[in-house]
């Protein structure tokens, strides 16, 4: 049976929906990635977050090679049904660069500034 969130979600023309990962206990925004119906279903059934990699064209199980997994605490669908919020327990850095989160470049009037 298809989970109701998959039925309610408004996927784009490629069958994807943006998902924002947020540390459940601090509220820190960690990253944004894409999910499809299969990755949503897997995340809900296993409790480990799974995304869809657009560059590789396949499921991307977060932390599969790095060990920096995300345990799904809660999943929320926004009011328009076109974005997911994943409340997660992050193990290690969330960003592939090794940064704790993917939002470490502040936009200023003069350009970009790296922040911790």
Swiss-Prot record:
Annotated GO MF terms: magnesium ion binding; phosphoribosyl-AMP cyclohydrolase activity; zinc ion binding
Record's cofactor remark: Binds 1 Mg(2+) ion per subunit. Binds 1 zinc ion per subunit.
Cellular component aspect of the GO annotation: cytoplasm
Presence of keyword Metal-binding: yes
UniProt cofactor(s): Mg(2+); Zn(2+)
A GO biological process held by the record: L-histidine biosynthetic process
Residues annotated as binding Zn(2+): 79, 95, 102
Primary location: cytoplasm
Associated pathway: Amino-acid biosynthesis; L-histidine biosynthesis; L-histidine from 5-phospho-alpha-D-ribose 1-diphosphate: step 3/9
Keywords for this protein: Amino-acid biosynthesis, Cytoplasm, Histidine biosynthesis, Hydrolase, Magnesium, Metal-binding, Zinc
Annotated compartments: Cytoplasm
The organism's place on the tree of life at top rank: Bacteria
Catalyses which reaction(s): 1-(5-phospho-beta-D-ribosyl)-5'-AMP + H2O = 1-(5-phospho-beta-D-ribosyl)-5-[(5-phospho-beta-D-ribosylamino)methylideneamino]imidazole-4-carboxamide
The protein's enzyme class: hydrolase
Family designation: Belongs to the PRA-CH family.
Subunit note: Homodimer.
Role: Catalyzes the hydrolysis of the adenine ring of phosphoribosyl-AMP.
Protein name: Phosphoribosyl-AMP cyclohydrolase
């Amino acid at each position: 049976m298809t989970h109701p969130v998959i039925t309610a979600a408004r996927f784009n023309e490629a069958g994807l929906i943006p998902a924002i990962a947020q540390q459940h206990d601090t509220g820190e925004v960690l990253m944004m990635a894409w999910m499809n119906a299969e990755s949503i279903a897997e995340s809900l059934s296993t409790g480990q977050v799974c995304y869809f990699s657009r560059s590789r064209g396949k499921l991307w199980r977060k932390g599969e090679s790095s060990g920096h997994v995300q345990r799904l605490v809660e999943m929320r669908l926004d009011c328009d049904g076109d974005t997911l919020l994943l409340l997660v327990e992050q193990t290690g850095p969330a960003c592939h660069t090794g940064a704790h989160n993917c939002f470490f470049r502040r936009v200023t009037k003069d350009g970009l500034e790296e922040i911790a």
